[in-house]
Amino acid sequence: MKIVARTIPPRSAWMLEQAGVHPLLARLYAARGVQTREELDDGLARLLAPDGLRGAHEAALLLADAIRDDKRLCIVADYDCDGATACAVALRGLRLLGAKHVSYLVPDRVVDGYGLTPPIAERVAATGADVLITVDNGIASVEGVAAAKARGLAVLVTDHHLPGPALPAADVLVNPNQPDCGFDSKSIAGVGVMFYVLLALRSELRARGVFDLPAAAGPPQGGRASPSGGGEAHEVASRGVGRPQPKLDVLLPLVALGTVADVVKLDANNRRLVAQGLRRIRAGVMPAGVAALFKAAGRNAAAATTFDFGFALGPRINAAGRLADMTLGIECLTTDDSARAEELARMLDGINRERRDIEGGMRDQALLLAESLFDEDGSETPRAAISVFDADFHEGVVGIVASRIKDRYHRPTFVFAASGAPGKEHELKGSGRSIPGFHLRDALDLVAKRHPGVLLRFGGHAMAAGCTVAEEHFETFERALAQVAAEWLDAASLTRRLDTDGPLAPEYLRVDLVDTLHREVWGQGFAPPTFSEEVEVISQRLVGEKHLALKLRHKGQPVDGIWFGHTEPLPPRVVIAFRLDADEWQGVRRVRFLVEGAEI
């Protein structure tokens, strides 16, 4: 591991500090590309306008007509947290905006596979639906959309995944990554895309006179033209014609949760969405299911952080899609009955505990399989890419295990399990996680071109992807992916690099400052503050057989530390990378270091 301090543009840090930003925060923000205080404004008026998202206006027209004509809408969702929150946002939002007949369907991960397939389209048609809406999927569903259209359904695809060479022939496509879309936030999650469609729909309904413009409202979307093209004058003219306009900001806690849990890049617009959601949760304004999930996870909603989304609530919702039925997660997020929400949250918590047990066994076996590859090569270091398969692996957990192996060896990693779908027993379904510099979906595309027929299906992003191969072709895939990785990745890329914010002055070891840092929005692409320093190790001991508890001396001051998931002892003096945390003991809160890595 190589610990590297980020470059801090001195002028940006100085300008932020002069604008009143705390010196430490100014340094952290500048290192993440922030140059002015205005960029930190997380007000709703600073959100990008829906009219910049290609297809949003057309989606609004389609949905407004469907609501006017009392048509039946059916949402087809993905089975992860982004898909569940997107489905919940769609259900709640469409009902708020006047839709009377809205249902949903989530494919079974094992039986149905991912996304809108022809069989799923048939099931939607059988419900009597008139309009099919995908959330967090659909951009690759060429055959599924065709099947839905053949059954007479209108199809609205809302997605954020990268498109393939052919786009589905949907009535409307809304995806920031589709060709010719100029929307500035290419990293918006599926739940964010659906939220933007609802904003556009509300504006269209307002333009039609269905809703009043709120009396205190100014120009829509922070002074920008409305998605209907009417502008401020049209909106003001429509006031008093219809019923009060529904508030869509009640959906922001769900948008924030799905955005963080999907590990999309937290660009400026995503950070604003997350900040707005956190603000409402901390104030106690959230769906009953979100409150219940905080309670089930033992987390304090009044002090909610992005960590809670990514490591407490998100995994509990994801567990339903991995091991059970994501309808549990969606029902939890859509019910307004607090008692029912708590019951569902407890069920999700139990499923997540089961997931942890399965994951632990799979992780240990996957590590053994990965290490056996070293022996085959006669090397003490892994291949440029790792692919492992075991007949006993559970396909609902392969993605998590791939992430663990990737973190352990700093290699692009795929973990495969046998398909449980009827008639597909000889297919292997794999989930992959990558490292910086290796675009996983592009790598799969190259493997497919070099070895036609090996990949039955594939898709995904730069850092995460999925694919299906015939069992007989697994070794071919394994070698082919490793070959692509060997060509694309050099020695520096294959060395784990931990970027930090450099040394930390002793005066910043304060609990109140730790709380300030925790309240900020951190995540993918806007990394949580991590510092690096040489420290003296006073004492160390194992806790729970798998964590290293430390007594350290940092610039002459004693401080406690903990390295979760690490058991090897540290030398007397060592450079560590660490995050700040506040630990409480006997009613007293103290700063401690959460160790992320060490140069040993």
Spans of features found by a protein language model:
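Non-catalytic interface/linker regions that flank or bridge core catalytic/transmembrane domains
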Residues: 2-3
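Hydrophobic helix-and-loop "lid/oligomerization" segment in the mid-to-C-terminal part
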Residues: 6-130, 151, 203-220, 224, ...
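A residue-level signal for conserved active-site and pocket-lining positions in enzyme catalytic cores
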Residues: 29, 133, 318, 516-517, ...
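Mid-to-C-terminal polyanion-binding domains and interfaces
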Residues: 65-69, 338-388, 422-426, 438, ...
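Short, ordered loop/turn segments at secondary-structure junctions
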Residues: 78-79, 107-110, 137-138, 160-163, ...
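Conserved phosphate-handling catalytic cores of large alpha/beta enzymes
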Residues: 125, 134, 138-216, 245-261, ...
